Amino acid sequence: MLPKIALVGRPNVGKSTLFNRLIRKNRAITHDRPGVTRDRMEGLVQSIGHPSFILIDTGGVILDSHYSTINIIDELHGFEKDIFQQVQLAIEESQAICLIVNARDGLLPFDEHLALFLRKTGKPILLAVNKVDGIEKEDQIVAEFHILGLPMIAVSAEHGHNIRQLENELSLLLPNNENIKDQSTAQAALKLAIIGRPNAGKSSIINAIIGKNKLIVSNIAGTTRDSIDIPFIFNKTQYLFVDTAGIRRRTKITDPVERFSVNASIKSATKANITLYVIDATEGITAQDKRLLDLLDTRKIPFILLINKTDLIAKKQKTLLSKSFKEELQFCPHIPILMVSAVTSSGLDQIIAMAEQVYLECSTRINTGVLNRAMEEIITRHQPPVVRRIRPKFFYLTQAETSPPTFVFFVNDAEKISETYVRYLERSLRKIFNLHHAPIRIRLRSSHKKRNQ
């Protein structure tokens, strides 16, 4: 595993902007308002000539100087306590720490308080004085931070000032025995996006599977705002969870930060190998859920439906509930539906296994000769309907793509093939080649010649 460095600081010092700058992606949500980052987010930092490492962006902790450095966690409440626990976990996992302060604000009591707290960890610390852009007498402004007694660098996350030097300084904090390791394994990890309406239990499911409280869990809708990548190992295999913000109806989103989160959620689903769509069993499938599930199905995005919080449903009702979900989702009958509970861990062991199965189906490549023998069998069993006294002719079948499997039928006149018959072709291919849950595309192409075998 690659070494980790945690970005730590009070709210609105520019941690997320610096995180985005270092990983060279617009992953963390940034906004000129304290407290936008709530969960910790991880990203890969790679630069020529320097060891690669994982950077952790953490939420800002709002503390006053009267808090003790020993019993901070006991003196906090609500979100402040949850966020600080995430910061502590990030620090524990990291080999080094980057403390971020705001040059525009100057040295504040909490900066000193936090520096003292971080020193007690015994881990290497680099002080990054951010937002130095446009400040006259930069050296004089930065000088006051020397009192913290930490190695320091002045940067501007927004304008990229001294970012390369920062990368170099951060890499020097890492132990030599944990330096560069091939990242191909991580890149090849199966990526699972997890989306759904707010408070459906997405973060709870992730926490239950990986066995760590990586994400803040709350009964307040909208707790998770960023799309967060979480690498983990399950049965000696590496995976990557992408936990995204809950999706609400766009007309109800007035907060610009939350609107950004919705866009990020949909984007994450298109980039992942498999998407997990979480629904609260006590609320059922809403009209918004149906629209989004239909969108995933239309775009041929492989997904699994997770019905969470089944521990709140009576045993006799679970069978009826599963049946009702299947009836409501007749427009995508191939989608697997798993009844799970993050609280009791019921059904969670099925999620990874099903994701692997769907991914394997999506990667299926079938020989052209095998496909054409299957096509002959399919058409012999049920020929296409006659249109204007002429029965459409099928010449041959080929597979154009994988992920999702895309099959192209060459026929004499594609316009004469009905949608009903296309659905028959899809059902038949699924049955013959065991493509039970993967989305597949069926394309018809007009041709006047039968390909030479």
From Swiss-Prot:
InterPro entries: G_ENGA, GTP-bd, GTPase_Der, KH_dom-like, KH_dom-like_a/b, P-loop_NTPase, Small_GTP-bd. Residues 364-448 form the KH-like domain. Residues 3-178, 190-363 form the EngA-type G domain. GO terms for molecular function: GTP binding; ribosome binding. Gene3D superfamilies: 3.30.300.20, P-loop containing nucleotide triphosphate hydrolases. The keyword Repeat applies. Disulfide bonds: none annotated. Keywords: GTP-binding, Nucleotide-binding, Repeat, Ribosome biogenesis. GTP 2 binds at residues 196-203, 243-247, 308-311. GTP 1 binds at residues 9-16, 57-61, 130-133. GO terms for biological process: ribosome biogenesis. NCBIfam families: GTPase_EngA, small_GTP. Associates with the 50S ribosomal subunit. Belongs to the TRAFAC class TrmE-Era-EngA-EngB-Septin-like GTPase superfamily. EngA (Der) GTPase family. GTPase that plays an essential role in the late steps of ribosome biogenesis. This is GTPase Der.
